Design a protein with these regions (language model features):
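Residue-level marker for the onset of beta-strands and adjacent loop->beta junctions
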Residues: 91, 101, 169, 194-196
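Extracellular/periplasmic catalytic domains that process cell-envelope and extracellular macromolecules
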Residues: 124-125, 150, 174, 191-192, ...
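Metallo-beta-lactamase
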Residues: 2, 7-10, 16-98, 103-130, ...
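Short, P/G- and charge-enriched loop/turn segments at secondary-structure junctions
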Residues: 90-93, 183-188
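Detector for the c-type heme attachment site
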Residues: 135-137
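Binuclear metal-ion centers of metallo-dependent hydrolases, dominated by the metallo-beta-lactamase
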Residues: 166-181, 192-193, 222, 246-301
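Hydrophobic/aromatic beta-strand patches that form the interior of the parallel beta-sheet core
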Residues: 132, 157, 181, 232, ...
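Active-site-proximal loop/helix segments of hydrolase catalytic cores
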Residues: 117, 186-249
Length: 301
């Protein structure tokens, strides 16, 4: 066994041992064949090699510079694009993780995005029926993509972009076969009512996406349509994960903001292995036994 491979194996064992010791028994990977304990240390080690400066250069010129995680980010986009085109939806929507808190969702009649950010995201501009943006931070939206969608007279629902779809109120939109309910939550202690939480319903199936949510915002979390089937959740920015999970009672939680490359290492906006282990354990304490991860390019539903 090579030295690097041995190091990865040790890292993975430490992750699993720590999760079990924290009361997390491994159900996090039940629905994610590609997100097994064997993958955690590999992704962690690969992303640690890429600084925010290198990531910024990649976003400008597309050069992966031999970094494995940037090559994976390119392949993830290609995988999502291919599967979106090839997938026919008859019932429950199909949901893909692209990067960070960015997702693409396909229903029987619609294709839309939430917080889509990728170097090549403009390739989706002509395909999307609408876009949802939780807040005004560069790791959650791209100006060119939003302009392109709005320029096609399609809604961009946000609390800050002055185009069709702008709102800072509690409001329900109906677009094709999708209902979207908006409400404001806090990003952190000083960005109050900065993030739009989206409650999304397609038929009898519902999704909750809370963007970046901070300490003390738990009372503002609300799901008028009952327990969401899926909650796309970032357990960072100071939110009390145990309280939030106990309140929302989602049937399934998938963590996002994994290894966001625009944040420096060990930043709480970069959900990496130490934060991840605590968050998984806290979700279990909050009562959700179906909590998992989605890496870039993974199909979630």
């Amino acid at each position: 066994m090579s030295e690097s491979r041995a190091g990865d194996m040790i890292g993975r064992r430490r992750f699993v041992a720590g999760a079990v010791a924290a009361g997390f028994t491994g159900s996090a990977w039940a629905n994610f064949p590609s997100v097994a304990s064997d993958d955690i240390a590999v992704w962690h080690n690969e992303t640690e090699l890429v600084s925010p400066v290198v990531y910024g250069q990649y976003m400008k010129d597309g050069g992966t510079r031999g970094f494995a995680c940037l090559e994976k980010l390119e392949k993830a986009f290609e995988k999502v694009m291919r599967e979106v085109k090839d997938t026919k939806v008859d019932g429950i929507p199909a949901v893909w993780s692209v990067y960070n808190m960015g997702y693409v969702i396909k229903t029987r009649k619609s294709l839309f995005s939430i917080d889509l950010v990728h170097r090549r995201d403009m390739e989706f501009a002509a395909m999307l029926d609408f876009a949802l943006v939780t807040h005004n931070h560069g790791d959650h939206y791209r100006k060119d993509l939003c302009r392109a969608i709005a320029g096609r007279r399609k809604p961009v629902i946000s609390n800050f972009i002055p185009v069709r779809g702008y709102t800072r109120a509690k409001k329900t939109f109906k677009i094709r076969d999708v209902e979207i309910r908006t409400s404001l939550i806090d990003h952190n202690d000083w960005l109050i009512d900065f993030t739009t939480a989206f409650e999304i319903k397609v038929g009898n199936w519902s999704l909750y996406h809370t963007g970046d949510s901070g300490r003390g915002t738990e009372p503002k979390l609300e799901t008028a349509w009952g327990r969401p089937d899926l909650w796309l959740f970032f357990p960072g920015c100071g939110i009390d994960t145990v309280k939030a999970v106990a309140k929302i009672k989602a049937k399934r939680i998938v963590f996002g903001h994994l290894w966001e490359l625009g944040h420096r290492q060990n930043h709480r906006g970069r959900l990496d292995e130490p934060l991840l282990r605590r968050a998984l354990a806290n979700a279990a304490k909050g009562g959700c036994k179906n909590t998992s991860l989605a890496f870039w390019g993974d199909r979630i539903v």
